[in-house]
């Protein structure tokens, strides 16, 4: 998010103030999903104005986990045309911000990245509750934000009018990823993995969590049986030992490397030196690793539960999307694409072209349009 905020801070039509309810992720700390202490190796707080409002809450994942009463004064005294809220509605701070915006006659923009009503924790009773509550919730917004086509369709299915929804694409800093990739010595990186330039390298880059379904990929890779191939698993998490045991059971441990947590500045080398990245998640609202990999010239295969598949992969080749959990389908897909290197090269080129219109430029333009719509709705021209 920080590269976008930096660009917005420099945009002549925007005057932004960024508020953090807490700095988790921006500073070193334990990431429970990685199961380790994480310190990102790029600056996340430079190049744009920001302030942290003290959190008086419990810092848990519940409603009172984020309770920042100072938001009321900040919004009320800020004289903002619009307030763009990224804090979820299950937090107290969301409602403080909403009420402060309403009393200030500031447009209030918020949205979701969900593409389905099915919750990540699979507690299915939440589906009918969301179906009843969300139409009311999103009508509170001056403009509703959708970062993908899948989210757009979900909001429309809930009865949110088309003119109340703005598609603001989920993007990364395209220029940075392409520039970093251009500096990578692909053969040298492969040498560090102990493989030659002709080895077919498959990459998994995500937390080793059950909903990311890395076991599907390990099993599909084994079934594919592609000669001279290597599977890289970049990431950490609670499934690591189970995955290592599975590679032993399948007899492929000599063709699988566990890289652990890989920091931001090291990722371009991974993507650039791999042939294809696979994201087998059972739920990924979008999955910006898809953006990153494509920008580094890596082909991408994803399950049909990955939001980025529809916007970034399907326009190039819908056959690179397979049914989530279907190990046989993924195995067949891997066997086919890894044996057709010329087509993989064509896919990379076409995907790179697609990213030219899915970039920070489009994101900021869509943000401006959404703000203008929201402001005009609460302050109509006389």
Question: What kind of feature is each model-predicted range?
Answer:
Residues 92, 107-109, 116-140:
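Nucleotide-sugar donor phosphate/pyrophosphate-binding loop at the beta->alpha transition
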Residues 191, 255, 336, 343-357:
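A short, well-ordered alpha-helix in the C-terminal region of glycosyltransferases
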Residues 196-212, 218-221:
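Conserved donor-binding/catalytic core segment of Leloir-type glycosyltransferases
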Residues 261-262, 269-274:
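Short alpha-helical donor nucleotide-sugar binding micro-motif in glycosyltransferases
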Residues 299-303:
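Short hydrophobic beta-strand element within catalytic cores of glycosyltransferases
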């Amino acid at each position: 998010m920080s590269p976008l905020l930096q660009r917005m801070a420099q945009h002549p039509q925007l005057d932004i103030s960024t508020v953090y309810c807490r700095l988790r992720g921006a500073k070193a700390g334990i990431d429970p999903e990685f199961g380790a202490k994480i310190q990102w190796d790029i600056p996340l707080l430079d190049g744009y104005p920001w302030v942290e409002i003290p959190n008086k809450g419990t810092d848990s994942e519940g409603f009172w986990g984020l309770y920042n009463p100072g938001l009321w004064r900040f919004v009320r005294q800020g004289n903002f045309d619009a307030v763009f809220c990224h804090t979820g509605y299950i937090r107290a701070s969301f409602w403080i911000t909403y009420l402060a915006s309403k009393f200030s006659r500031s447009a209030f923009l918020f949205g979701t990245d969900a593409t389905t009503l099915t919750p990540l924790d699979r507690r299915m009773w939440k589906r009918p509750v969301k179906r009843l509550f969300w139409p009311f919730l999103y009508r509170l917004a001056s403009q509703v934000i959708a970062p993908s086509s899948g989210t757009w369709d979900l909001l429309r299915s809930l009865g949110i009018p088309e003119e109340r929804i703005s598609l603001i694409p989920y993007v990364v800093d395209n220029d940075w990823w392409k520039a970093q990739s251009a500096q990578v010595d692909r053969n040298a990186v492969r040498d560090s993995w102990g493989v030659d330039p002709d080895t077919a390298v498959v990459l998994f880059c995500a937390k080793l969590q059950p909903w990311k379904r890395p076991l599907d990929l390990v099993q599909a890779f084994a079934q594919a049986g592609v000669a001279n191939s290597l599977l890289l698993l970049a990431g950490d998490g609670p499934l690591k030992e189970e995955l290592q045991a599975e590679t032993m059971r399948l007899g492929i441990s000599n063709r699988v490397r566990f890289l652990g947590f890989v920091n931001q500045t090291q990722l371009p080398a991974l993507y650039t030196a791999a042939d294809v990245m696979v994201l087998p998640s059972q739920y990924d609202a979008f999955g910006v690793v898809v953006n990153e990999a494509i920008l580094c010239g890596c082909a991408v295969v994803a399950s049909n539960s990955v939001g980025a598949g529809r916007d970034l992969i399907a326009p190039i080749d819908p056959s690179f999307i397979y049914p989530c959990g279907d190990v046989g389908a993924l195995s067949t897909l891997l066997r086919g694409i890894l044996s057709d290197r010329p087509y993989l090269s064509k896919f990379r080129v076409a995907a790179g072209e697609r990213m030219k219109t899915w970039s920070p430029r489009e994101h900021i333009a869509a943000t401006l349009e959404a703000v203008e719509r929201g402001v005009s709705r609460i302050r109509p021209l006389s």
